[in-house]
Amino acid sequence: MNTSKILFSLFLVLSLLVSCEKDNNHSEDDELATRMNQFIQSNLSTFYLWYDEIPNIKPESKKDPKEYFKVLLSSKDKWSLITDDANGLLEEMAGTGETYGYGLAYGRFKDSDKCFAIVQYVYPGSPAAEKLKRGDIIVELNSQSFTESDLSKLTNPGTLHLGMGKQEGDAIAPSGKTVTITSRKMDADPVLITKLFERGNHKIGYLMYTNFTKTFNTSIVKAFNEFKEAGITDLVLDLRYNHGGDDDASTFLCSAIVPKEKAVVGTLLSKETWNSPCQKIFESDSQYENLLNRFFVETNCNLDLPSQKVYILTSGETVSASEYTIACLKAFMDVELVGTKTYGKYVTMYAFSPQYEENGKLVADKELANWLIFPVCSRFTNIDGYPNSLEGMTPQHEVKEDLFNGIQLGDENEPLLAEALALISGTRRMQAKGRSIETSP
């Protein structure tokens, strides 16, 4: 999972950086780049999960810290990242950054490198919500067709002129309609949808959750207490588009769903495994226990479901903290997965900001304050050691969603939700044939 907290230092001896003297033969930019590269090398050599695979490349050999960071990473690593816009990234992860307020899936036209996008969801009150809805098709970006290399432009802040598409049989064609949206800063509450359904003796709560961020734990409290007041017997948790996020938020969510008698505050919830040098040090000193183990926390909204079962909707975009949540819940209650196979990311990333050593203390490097690195530092498992492979989690009930059918999230006829409702009520559901596109986080 990606953690949004800054680890300024776990302890000084492991984070000690080699000071860099200014060299009059190099430009100030070169000196700053070298200093940043030294910081990268120092932290990866200490905390990186695959620390023993880091190549011996000198910090001064690269002028671009992003390039230097990349060449040090293991071939196993698809996730570690670096940014020179620390505030922007942290705001995005906290759900308070600049955004258009939509989630998109992408596809490629047959026999072409040209792509299209389909709206998965929009946040209420967002720029996208004013003009777009789930199922809308985008075929042009700023009056031009677009390829895979252009996809990031659909989420980068600014103003977009989107050429819309329409279905014509099995094909997609331009509709002639153009939509203009401008990004803005907003609070993107990850509790996107809450609904109640009744099926026979079952009162079912449905919650669509798009991102793990403790900024919005209060939204979980509000939603779950409303579910409790309604007397729900069953929960459907929709994580199909949840790419992960804050470990504190996932711990909180687990603590609110696991049956109350088992979710005792301070009881072990999950385990973390670091590289061998870090693991040895952490195990030798109890002050680092929270880096090895995570524990149930107080939530004031535990559902204490009578069924002691939860239904979770999944896809290939169910990633990291979402998978952590599924794994942890499995150790304490029945978990039924509905949808398609999850992504398969069972590692934790920590954020480090540039610092240097001064008089035995670590001091923030103000000249590099805009930089931040997020290396993979540990693997997670539940208390039973699951998951123990690199494969995604396969649902017991496979259902492929169809973004082309125009059915909105939270609608009882939406295929994944409809399947979960049918499983809870014990009724059979006829799966409609439809088209699906592959997506990835």
Predicted regions and their residues:
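Bacterial N-terminal signal peptides that target proteins for export
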Residues: 1-8
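Short strand-loop junctions, especially beta-strand C-caps/beta-turns
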Residues: 122, 210-212, 240-242, 313-316
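C-terminal "post-core" interaction segments
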Residues: 216-227, 232-234, 243-441
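A general structural signal for short secondary-structure junctions and capping/turn motifs
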Residues: 4, 92-95, 152-154, 197-198, ...
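C-terminal motif of bacterial Sec signal peptides marking the signal peptidase cleavage site
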Residues: 16-19
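Flexible, low-complexity junctional segments that flank or bridge functional domains
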Residues: 21-234, 256-259, 431, 435-441
